[in-house]
From Swiss-Prot:
Assembly: Associated with the NPC, however it may not be a stable component of the NPC complex since it shuttles between the nucleus and the cytoplasm. Interacts with nuclear pore complex proteins NUP155 and NUP42. Isoform 2 does not interact with NUP42. Able to form a heterotrimer with NUP155 and NUP42 in vitro.
Region of interest (Interaction with NUP42), residue spans: 656-698
Alphabetical UniProt keywords: Coiled coil, Cytoplasm, Disease variant, mRNA transport, Nuclear pore complex, Nucleus, Phosphoprotein, Protein transport, Translocation, Transport
Gene Ontology molecular functions: identical protein binding; inositol hexakisphosphate binding; phospholipid binding; translation initiation factor binding
Descriptive protein name: mRNA export factor GLE1
Biased composition (Low complexity): 65-79, 86-103
Region annotation Mediates the shuttling between the nucleus and the cytoplasm: where it falls in the sequence: 444-483
Region listing for Interaction with NUP155, in residue ranges: 1-29
Sites of Phosphoserine modification: S41, S88, S99
Amino acid sequence: MPSEGRCWETLKALRSSDKGRLCYYRDWLLRREDVLEECMSLPKLSSYSGWVVEHVLPHMQENQPLSETSPSSTSASALDQPSFVPKSPDASSAFSPASPATPNGTKGKDESQHTESMVLQSSRGIKVEGCVRMYELVHRMKGTEGLRLWQEEQERKVQALSEMASEQLKRFDEWKELKQHKEFQDLREVMEKSSREALGHQEKLKAEHRHRAKILNLKLREAEQQRVKQAEQERLRKEEGQIRLRALYALQEEMLQLSQQLDASEQHKALLKVDLAAFQTRGNQLCSLISGIIRASSESSYPTAESQAEAERALREMRDLLMNLGQEITRACEDKRRQDEEEAQVKLQEAQMQQGPEAHKEPPAPSQGPGGKQNEDLQVKVQDITMQWYQQLQDASMQCVLTFEGLTNSKDSQAKKIKMDLQKAATIPVSQISTIAGSKLKEIFDKIHSLLSGKPVQSGGRSVSVTLNPQGLDFVQYKLAEKFVKQGEEEVASHHEAAFPIAVVASGIWELHPRVGDLILAHLHKKCPYSVPFYPTFKEGMALEDYQRMLGYQVKDSKVEQQDNFLKRMSGMIRLYAAIIQLRWPYGNRQEIHPHGLNHGWRWLAQILNMEPLSDVTATLLFDFLEVCGNALMKQYQVQFWKMLILIKEDYFPRIEAITSSGQMGSFIRLKQFLEKCLQHKDIPVPKGFLTSSFWRS
């Protein structure tokens, strides 16, 4: 179909021609009558003619060069050629689609563009052209109005869009802020969580640290307590060692004193039937034993309890040795005296037989009476060995006082307080001794024993111990012994039954702490010399008050106590002494002998019967002693004791009666009735207040 292709090319060329680019109104038929009328009417200038003359013609004249045309040719050509008129804007736009229609404000620009010279048409064409242009103007104005409205609408839309965009921006900002806030919250929660985890971990570490610190503190505290405990144990060990060492020295001192007493018995060697050298050899061995113990203890810093116990056993053996020797000496002296009496009686009988019936007259009174003289068989002074024993006890007591002199004379308030506490701890338990119950008595004994052993005891709400002061033990021993004797002087003197509980505690303490027993004897002998027995003699230059004090009287402001009170005190102390020598602490070691047993009671009775009686004193003391201790002596010595009672009745009563005045016969009669009753019934009753086995179960 090549012909068909050429047709399309023709149409395309026609469309591209000036005619083809013209715009045609399809609605011109609606106005056809007007158009036809215009064509039929006479031509006339268009209303746009003035605009053409003003705007188009000047430009056309400027564009034609002056050299090529002359005025004549120009005017001729103008007359020959058709008139030129400017193309309408619509026509221009039809020929040039790229140039859009412009509003009124763009006329100057259109005018500045080049204008094509068109031949002036007829008036009808000009009219049509003017209508077209008018229509275009109207259409342009409508377009301008529409454009304005469109612009306003667009502006409103733009404003609405702007407002919507602003709101969306706000929402976006809010959403972004919310997102940031949420992220911040999440971050803060994460940080808080991590912080809590860190704090939890830190608390866990702190707890572990506290636990480890607590364990470490406990270990440190235990170590410190262990160290303090070890230090305290070491201190106590040293103190106990020092106490044991002092005790060993005291034992050695006492052993040496006993050895001296043993050596002093050489004067009785002729009377003894036993070998004195054996006693001396054993005594020397015991002294060497204690010296060896002390020497070994010095090498090993402090003595042990076994060493002290061994030394105490050696001392007890030495005491027993000396006591046995004393008994042998007493027995030898008694045999010697009896032999001398028998020889004297034989000589007296021979003299009576030689003198005849006058020899059967009644002999004079054995005691020194009116106009008579003292019997030569009895003595006023005590035996030398007894006096030595008495003096040793007094020296030991004085030495003990000198030992704690620093404590008693100290001006330090702390030392004074310690002294008062120790004195109360030593004396108050003794004051509490009674016959209420055996368990109560045991508590008191344990408290005194603990105090003397260096253990702390409670006194006055405070803890007291002799280790508080180096001189504390000596002070307590002295004050304790003094209190025991004072209880006998006061309590036993008023209540005779009190002698037994006091005596059993004193005996038990004496057995465990021998030095206390020696101090008890020293205090007893000093306050009651008849307990030795010992009758002090008046010496030249001695004051009467001093002599009365030596006899045991209390002298205050140069006034001597009454005789009844004096006898009452002496009676209480003798009763206490008689109870001590027969009683033993029931919870002690029964295998050991009594530290001051019945043999000393027998010695006391024998020695007082060998001395001249004292008016009112001897009868009182004999009655008290026999009433308390007679039953025990009877069981111990049996026949020998009854012989002694018969001797008292037959030989000693006349001597007492001879020196006793009528106003002082009360004590003598009481002794005589008691003795006659015992001899009649051949029995001495158990003393009133004696502690039975049922008492210790209470």
